[in-house]
């Protein structure tokens, strides 16, 4: 059986858009740093990285869709942090963000990596933004790199 899968290879010609929420910026800025650092370490030049900020995670899908439809990037990385508050509001934001980002990817055909944290506490968010549980922004960047390589293989 032939197996085709993306590799974590240097993609010096690939362009990546990081679409990130400003809300919970203490956390999201660390996700951005992790994603950008990972891309640079894998050979992506600074001029091939674009950061687009939106007010919050609920607004991520529209910006992701526009970037993907415009052909501005070979992959988009969605970054945000949805943290439980005193109501169920976080559940609605997280669900719609997830659905919207997935729809943007499927509608555009451009890989979108999902680096949006959905957590119960600020402490959990901090753990996932570069401490105990790694950096989910960096993990999303690795996924984006692999998907760009895979899409190129599938087009060949």
From Swiss-Prot:
Keywords in alphabetical order:
Riboflavin biosynthesis, Transferase
Coiled-coil annotated spans: none
Where along the chain is (2S)-2-hydroxy-3-oxobutyl phosphate bound? 86-87, 128
Q: Which CDD domains match?
A: Lumazine_synthase-I
Positions bound to 5-amino-6-(D-ribitylamino)uracil:
23, 57-59, 81-83, 114
Catalysed transformations (reactions): (2S)-2-hydroxy-3-oxobutyl phosphate + 5-amino-6-(D-ribitylamino)uracil = 6,7-dimethyl-8-(1-D-ribityl)lumazine + phosphate + 2 H2O + H(+)
Q: Does the keyword Magnesium apply?
A: no
> GO biological process annotations for this chain's record?
riboflavin biosynthetic process
Q: Give the pathway listed in the UniProt entry for this protein.
A: Cofactor biosynthesis; riboflavin biosynthesis; riboflavin from 2-hydroxy-3-oxobutyl phosphate and 5-amino-6-(D-ribitylamino)uracil: step 1/2
Tell me, what is one Gene Ontology molecular-function annotation carried by this entry? 6,7-dimethyl-8-ribityllumazine synthase activity
Q: Which residues form the active site?
A: 89
Q: What enzyme class is recorded for this protein?
A: transferase
Q: Name one GO cellular component term.
A: riboflavin synthase complex
Subunit structure comment from the entry: Forms an icosahedral capsid composed of 60 subunits, arranged as a dodecamer of pentamers.
List the PANTHER family hit by this protein, alphabetically.
6,7-DIMETHYL-8-RIBITYLLUMAZINE SYNTHASE (PTHR21058:SF0), 6,7-DIMETHYL-8-RIBITYLLUMAZINE SYNTHASE DMRL SYNTHASE LUMAZINE SYNTHASE (PTHR21058)
- NCBIfam families the UniProt entry points to: lumazine-synth, PRK00061.1-4
Q: What is this protein called?
A: 6,7-dimethyl-8-ribityllumazine synthase
Species annotation: Halorhodospira halophila (strain DSM 244 / SL1) (Ectothiorhodospira halophila (strain DSM 244 / SL1))
Record gene name:
ribH
């Amino acid at each position: 059986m032939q197996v085709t899968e993306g590799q974590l290879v240097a993609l010096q010609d690939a362009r990546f858009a990081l679409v990130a929420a400003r809300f919970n910026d203490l956390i999201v800025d660390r996700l951005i740093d992790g994603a950008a650092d990972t891309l640079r370490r894998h050979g992506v030049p600074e001029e091939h990285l674009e950061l687009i900020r939106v007010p919050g995670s609920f607004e991520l899908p529209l910006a992701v869709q526009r970037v993907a439809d415009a052909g501005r990037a070979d992959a988009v990385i969605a970054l945000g942090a949805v943290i439980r508050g005193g109501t169920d509001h976080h559940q609605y934001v997280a669900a719609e963000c997830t659905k919207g980002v997935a729809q943007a990817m499927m509608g555009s055909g451009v890989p979108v990596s999902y680096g949006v944290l959905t957590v119960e506490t600020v402490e959990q968010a901090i753990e996932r933004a570069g401490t105990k549980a790694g950096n989910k922004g960096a993990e999303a960047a690795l996924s984006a790199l692999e998907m760009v390589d895979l899409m190129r293989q599938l087009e060949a």
